[in-house]
Amino acid sequence: MSITNEQILDAIAEMSVMQVVELISAMEEKFGVSAAAAVVSGPAAAAAVEEQTEFNVILAAAGANKVAVIKAVRGATGLGLKEAKALVDGAPASVKEAVSKEEAEALKKELEEAGATVEVK
């Protein structure tokens, strides 16, 4: 004779809370499992997959041709000569922040052609 699920549920329903806790503990030991709830991280995983839309262009080093780099920085940012020179001399420094990927890549290419070392973050 086999015991049905209905009979098992009826037997558990008649148990006290302490008896149910002991039953769960015994089942965990016998089957090598844990009754702990699994952690679900749905929204956090979706945020990690989200693609970055804003980038910062960082001048890591001016390189050998500092004058050309200063001109490129002035053209890209609209800074005056003194401000652009200070930015280039203060490398590593942020040239532009929160720009699109296309704009960041174009600026990186322009600065690298002038001889600078550039990072896009």
Swiss-Prot record:
A GO molecular-function descriptor: mRNA binding
Keyword terms, alphabetized: Ribonucleoprotein, Ribosomal protein
Ranges annotated as spanning the membrane: none
Pfam annotation, one family: Ribosomal_L12_N
GO BP term, pick one: translation
Ribonucleoprotein keyword on record: yes
This protein's GO CC annotations: cytosolic large ribosomal subunit
UniProt xrefs under InterPro entries: Ribosomal_bL12, Ribosomal_bL12_C, Ribosomal_bL12_C/ClpS-like, Ribosomal_bL12_oligo, Ribosomal_bL12_oligo_N_sf
Domain of life: Bacteria
Coiled coil: none
Family: Belongs to the bacterial ribosomal protein bL12 family.
Subunit relationships: Homodimer. Part of the ribosomal stalk of the 50S ribosomal subunit. Forms a multimeric L10(L12)X complex, where L10 forms an elongated spine to which 2 to 4 L12 dimers bind in a sequential fashion. Binds GTP-bound translation factors.
Biological function: Forms part of the ribosomal stalk which helps the ribosome interact with GTP-bound translation factors. Is thus essential for accurate translation.
Descriptive protein name: Large ribosomal subunit protein bL12
